[in-house]
Amino acid sequence: MNLLDPFMKMTDEQEKGLSGAPSPTMSEDSAGSPCPSGSGSDTENTRPQENTFPKGEPDLKKESEEDKFPVCIREAVSQVLKGYDWTLVPMPVRVNGSSKNKPHVKRPMNAFMVWAQAARRKLADQYPHLHNAELSKTLGKLWRLLNESEKRPFVEEAERLRVQHKKDHPDYKYQPRRRKSVKNGQAEAEEATEQTHISPNAIFKALQADSPHSSSGMSEVHSPGEHSGQSQGPPTPPTTPKTDVQAGKVDLKREGRPLAEGGRQPPIDFRDVDIGELSSDVISNIETFDVNEFDQYLPPNGHPGVPATHGQVSYTGSYGISSTAPTPATAGHVWMSKQQAPPPPPQQPPQAPQAPQAPPQQQAPPQPQQAPQQQQAHTLTTLSSEPGQSQRTHIKTEQLSPSHYSEQQQHSPQQISYSPFNLPHYNPSYPTITRSQYDYTDHQNSGSYYSHAAGQGSGLYSTFTYMNPAQRPMYTPIADTSGVPSIPQTHSPQHWEQPVYTQLTRP
């Protein structure tokens, strides 16, 4: 009541200023005149006020309510108690109960609810433009200001309603309804999605840790190349965007690569994974390593210059490597040589003539290894044994090629050490690669690198799986060169597609 006094004074003054006639009624109402007259005077007085003083409406409401409520509230309560004109209280319970199979019985209204319901109706009629939320705030404030005598009628009505409610529902027990399953289901779904995303993200993070710039930047930058290289297990997580672009391919590659990934990280089962990993390494190495040369090769693939170049080149390199796939470690070394090749061109010169595919790394070993390649084309088994060793090297190399194989990238440091051209590894691996590459040439020439990669889930063809169709032209020549990686590839990265390579590959 005290809080409302200033409001009442203000409103009285405003009312006097606005309309002289209504002000006496207001004073009468506040004095305790019957509620209807008070309500009428309030309506007349406050509407002009509301229009004139929009900001003062809450105050007017409060004061008008204050004026009415001692009288009007009692009147409303008396109406409810006497005639049940105010039937909303019992009716909702009964209506709801009848409407539902298992009727939901509402709790009986307490004193404040009785007051709020009656007062809200009166106020809503008088001030239809008022917002319901504002009404609720005002009603709550007024209720706190009421004294015991003013609250008594509402308390009595609430008690009457409680007794009546107990009669109507003798077995009623308050059972608050709890919302079920929606939040839980959503949470479960979110958890599942989080888990789903966690594994790729974790892998991707691991890859990034292995090759921070190359795994994140290169895989993303080389979306075309990586798409082809998505089959590479590690690259796929880093290349989540790529996964979206080539979801199907990525899935196939992932299926082909799961073992490779598992083997890659702790074991050196790069026989299956090496080719793809080498492709990844090649791609990342190419980035750092022969972006210009790869740009030359990019046009055939139709990929944009640098990223395509990286993807293509790395695939080219990976072809060389994939041809070395039997000797994934060797391929890794070769790629490492590439990756390191830019720093050590002297080592590359022998390699450079050989392979545009794996320009520096593969090139140097392949020339001396041309004979060994053909000879050791039979040594695929040897390469298989070597791949373990060379695969370890490979893993390191893959680190050098951060984009595609995080695991390889992890191993890249070692491969870098091998980058000084582990010719011993290269020699056996290249001969192995020679036949592997020849096989790749067939697959690449077939023009379905992905299908071959999928079918050829074994490390060698998986590399081709990484190749993008756009990069196929390069790969086909590269495949040929990788078939004879040491000889034709070394001629020049530009000459990857030379028919000579194909011929060499065929032997």
Curated annotation (Swiss-Prot):
Cellular compartment(s): Nucleus
Bias (Pro residues): 341-369
Describe how it is modified after translation: Acetylated; acetylation impairs nuclear localization and ability to transactivate expression of target genes. Deacetylated by SIRT1.
Annotated segments matching region Disordered: 1-67, 160-250, 335-429, 477-507
Q: Could you tell me which residues belong to the region Dimerization (DIM)? A: 63-103
Tell me the CDD domains matching this sequence.
HMG-box_SoxE
- List residues of cross-link (Glycyl lysine isopeptide (Lys-Gly) (interchain with G-Cter in ubiquitin)): K396
Q: What would be one Gene Ontology cellular-component term for the protein?
A: nucleus
Q: Which UniProt keywords apply?
A: Acetylation, Activator, Differentiation, DNA-binding, Isopeptide bond, Nucleus, Phosphoprotein, Transcription, Transcription regulation, Ubl conjugation
Q: Does the keyword Lipoprotein apply?
A: no
Residue ranges forming the DNA-binding region read 105-173
> Where are residues bearing Phosphoserine located in the sequence?
S64, S211
Task: Give the location of motif 9aaTAD 2 in residue numbers.
Answer: 290-298
Please report, in chain numbering, the residue ranges of the motif 9aaTAD 3: 458-466
Q: Where is this region: Transactivation domain (TAM)?
A: 224-307
Q: Where is the composition biased (Polar residues)?
A: 42-52, 378-420, 483-507
Q: Which GO terms describe its molecular function?
A: beta-catenin binding; bHLH transcription factor binding; chromatin binding; cis-regulatory region sequence-specific DNA binding; DNA binding; DNA-binding transcription activator activity, RNA polymerase II-specific; DNA-binding transcription factor activity; DNA-binding transcription factor activity, RNA polymerase II-specific
Where mainly located? nucleus
- Ranges of biased composition (kind: Basic and acidic residues): 56-67, 160-174
Record note on domains: The transactivation domains TAM and TAC (for transactivation domain in the middle and at the C-terminus, respectively) are required to contact transcriptional coactivators and basal transcriptional machinery components and thereby induce gene transactivation.
According to the record's subunit comment, the protein's assembly and interactions are: Homodimer; homodimerization is required for activity. Interacts (via C-terminus) with ZNF219; forming a complex that binds to the COL2A1 promoter and activates COL2A1 expression. Interacts with DDRGK1. Interacts with EP300/p300. Interacts with beta-catenin (CTNNB1); inhibiting CTNNB1 activity by competing with the binding sites of TCF/LEF within CTNNB1.
This chain's function reads: Transcription factor that plays a key role in chondrocytes differentiation and skeletal development. Specifically binds the 5'-ACAAAG-3' DNA motif present in enhancers and super-enhancers and promotes expression of genes important for chondrogenesis, including cartilage matrix protein-coding genes COL2A1, COL4A2, COL9A1, COL11A2 and ACAN, SOX5 and SOX6. Also binds to some promoter regions. Plays a central role in successive steps of chondrocyte differentiation.
State what protein this is by name: Transcription factor SOX-9
